[in-house]
Swiss-Prot record:
UniProt name for this protein: Acyl carrier protein 3, chloroplastic
Transit peptide, start-end: 1-51
InterPro entries linked to this entry: ACP (IPR003231), ACP-like_sf (IPR036736), ACP_chloroplastic (IPR044813), PKS_PP-bd (IPR020806), PP-bd_ACP (IPR009081), Ppantetheine_attach_site (IPR006162)
Modification(s) after translation: 4'-phosphopantetheine is transferred from CoA to a specific serine of apo-ACP by acpS. This modification is essential for activity because fatty acids are bound in thioester linkage to the sulfhydryl of the prosthetic group.
Gene responsible for this protein: ACP3
Gene Ontology cellular component annotations, sorted alphabetically: chloroplast; chloroplast stroma
Keyword Ribosomal protein in record: no
Residues covered by the Carrier domain: 56-131
Length: 136
């Protein structure tokens, strides 16, 4: 009997034998006898999905602060993956963004942590981490 180990959930069905892994990839095999084994692999197209650890509300507030600090128009798109540098922010602008975030959320960021922020998502995740610490 063939054995296949995967990290995704699997289900093995009776005749024709088919192994389904998740919803995006199907691997199947069939055999008439032990000596006649065939295996087919079909890769389905993948789509890029950006996942954000921070809450959407936090990301939205960070976007608003960034928009205000950099004097951006509403038409300028800012997402969780947006890098401050891509918006034209230099190191001084980043310091002003951090100060605006501290004021908006009522937190204080250590300089080492503040320097590691390069995207809206990183800022939002750090803010949520600091808010959790503050609540303790």
């Amino acid at each position: 009997m063939a054995s296949i180990a995967t990290s995704a959930s699997t289900s093995l069905q009776a005749r024709p034998r088919q192994l389904v892994i998740g919803a995006k990839q199907v691997k199947s095999f069939s055999y008439g006898s032990r000596s006649n084994l065939s295996f087919n692999l079909r890769q389905l197209p993948t789509r890029l999905t950006v996942y954000c650890a921070a809450k959407p509300e936090t990301v939205d507030k960070v976007c608003a602060v960034v928009r205000k600090q950099l004097s951006l128009k509403e038409a300028d798109e800012i997402t969780a993956a947006t890098k401050f540098a891509a918006l034209g922010a230099d190191s001084l602008d980043t310091v002003e963004i951090v100060m605006g975030l501290e004021e908006e959320f009522g937190i204080e960021m250590a300089e080492e942590k503040a320097q590691s922020i390069a995207t809206v998502e990183q800022a939002a995740a750090l803010i949520e981490e600091l808010l959790l610490e503050k609540a303790k």
